[in-house]
Structure formats: C-alpha cells, structure tokens
Curated annotation (Swiss-Prot):
This is Fucose-specific lectin. The lineage of its organism: Eukaryota, Fungi, Dikarya, Ascomycota, Pezizomycotina. It comes from the Eukaryota. Alpha-L-fucose 4 binds at residues 177, 188. It comes from Aspergillus fumigatus (Neosartorya fumigata). The keyword Coiled coil does not apply. Pfam families: Fungal_lectin (PF07938). The gene is fleA.
Length: 314
C-alpha cells in the first residue's frame, strides 16, 4: 500500500544527501519535478510541498555536497539539459547558484556527482557530469566563476557517477576519487595534489548493470591513508558495497539491502574507525509505500540494519 505523502515522491527519483555528523538533509524529486528537502534533527521532518528548493527536469539526477550544513549545494538538470545549482548559505537561505548561468550543456541522460574540496575553508567545488560526446567532464568553482576542468574520458552513456574528496594529513591539498562505468565495468579515476589526475582506470567491479546508480563516501583520512565505501545497485536488485581500507586496498564486496529495480542511491558518513565510528547512512527506494525513500544504517555498535523505513513526506 501507498500513502498520500509517498505518492508525491517520484518513483526512481534522484536522491542526494548531506550532513554535519548526525544532522541530516536528504534531497529528492516529487512527481511535479520539484526538488524537496527532508531533514533529521533528532527526528525526521519536512519533505512536503513547503520544502521545495527548486525545480528540475522530471527524472533529473540529483547530487549534493556541503561544508557541514553551513554551505549546501544541490545540482540537477534543466529541461534543456544544462547543469543548474540550488545553493544554501547559513544566514542567507536558499537561492539559485551561479552554475546555471554558465549554461553547461550535458547529455540528456547525464548523471551528476558533486564535491566540495576537502581540507580547506575556501568554497571550492567540483562537479562531474557526462557531455553529449559521452565523456565525463569536470566543472570547477574556485571563487572566480564556473569553468570547465579536466575531461576524464569516455564512459558508458548514462553512467552513474560517484565522487568523494578528502585530504591526506601529509599532502598539501585535497584528493578526489570518482567512479563511473565503462562498458559494464565499474572504474575509478584518482586525483592527488602532487600528481594531478592519474591516467589509469582502476576496475573495482567487473560487471554491473548498465546505468546502475553509483554513490561513494570516504572517512578517516590520515597519513597517506583513507577509508572509502562505494555503493551500486547490482543485477540482483540489491545495493552492493565495495570497501577500500588502508593497507588492504579494494577488498570487501557484498550485498547490503534490497531495492527496487533502477533505484538511485545516496550515501553519507561521519566519524572514523579511530574514534569508534564511522556512521554510515544510505538512502534509496525499496518499495516501502511503493515510492518512499528509505534508509539503511551502519554503526560500530549495531552493524548493518534498516533505519527509517520511509522518510517524510511518506
């Protein structure tokens, strides 16, 4: 059965999430094309037609990144398949960001990933999307306008894109990791400040369904060490997790939780193994009330379990 609230959520909606520790924000699209915000501040709230931050092409991807919750950026596509940005700054509230004015044209089936560069107080953004020629393009904000960055080469048309940024404690600048599909492989490209973009593609999974959702997070950055978790929807209609752990590389791959076919996925994390963490939160659609967004939780105390079965407005 459904609920009136769940019926407002687009089936296979794009999903994005940001956080400052356990203060959570989740973004999704409603059936009218509006992008809504649900929030967790001790309990779940919002997600109604009063919590719309902007409008996008129906079926648009939704990506988000934040500096804590003081600065939030949400990315979607316009009807004309150009990138657009909804921005929140504490003290200002929501407004239309500058990216839309750049009129960056992307493929109509492009997905989006977004990161604030880690380890700096400056608001530096990197957006990843697929151009009409099916290459993955980086778009950069360094405070002086939006510009095209590095082109990361060809990818499967309509590939999911996951990205994360972190800062090794012994490196002078942020690192970036991005994941997408070439043919059916899931691959990683890497950027480190002393090397730039490494030319090689690292395969993390040999065969995944075409256009599967991809989401990624990182935590526990240390001296040339990082922990990363990458998620995608496999052909068994469950979310799979691929782990990168310091000293082990990519090692642990396995199923997490069932989803609807074609579900999108968002992941957030906080804390680290060194400090009795991390905490992981995964957002997806698994058929609860047909189209509600659901939550999966991992923490050290309880391990893997389902969290909130249906986020507001469901």
């Amino acid at each position: 059965m459904s609920t009136p609230g769940a019926q407002q959520v687009l089936f296979r909606t794009g999903i994005a999430a940001v956080n400052s520790t356990n203060h959570l924000r989740v973004y999704f699209q409603d059936v009218y094309g509006s992008i809504r915000e649900s929030l967790y501040e001790g309990s779940w709230a919002n997600g109604t037609e009063k919590n719309v931050i902007g409008n996008a092409k129906l079926g648009s991807p939704v990506a988000a990144t934040s500096k804590e919750l003081k600065h939030i950026r949400v990315y979607t596509l316009t009807e004309g398949n150009t990138l657009q940005e909804f921005a929140y700054d504490s003290g200002t509230g929501w407004y239309n960001g500058g990216l839309g004015g750049a009129k960056f044209q992307v493929a109509p089936y492009s997905r989006i990933a977004a990161v604030f560069l880690a380890g700096t107080d400056a608001l530096q953004l990197r957006i990843y999307a697929q151009k009409p020629d099916n290459t993955i393009q980086e778009y950069m904000w360094n405070g002086d306008g939006w510009k095209e960055g590095t082109n990361l080469g060809g990818a499967l048309p309509g590939t999911g894109i996951g990205a994360t940024s972190f800062r090794y404690t012994d490196y002078n600048g942020p690192s970036i990791r991005i994941w997408f599909q070439t043919d059916l492989k899931l691959v990683q490209r890497a950027y480190d400040p002393h090397k730039g973009w490494y030319p090689d593609l690292v395969t993390i999974f040999d065969r995944a369904p075409p256009r599967t959702a991809i989401a990624a997070t990182s935590f526990g950055a240390g001296n040339s060490s990082i922990y990363m978790r990458i998620y995608f929807v496999n052909s068994d209609n469950t979310i799979w997790q691929v782990c990168w752990d310091h000293g082990k590389g990519y090692h642990d791959k396995g199923t997490i939780t069932p989803v609807i076919q074609g579900s999108e996925v968002a992941i957030i994390s906080w804390g680290s193994f060194a400090n009795n963490g991390p905490d992981l939160r995964l957002y997806f659609q698994n058929g609860t009330y047909i189209s509600a967004v659901s939550e999966w939780v991992w923490n050290r105390a309880h391990g893997s379990q389902l969290g909130r079965s249906a986020l507001p407005p469901a």
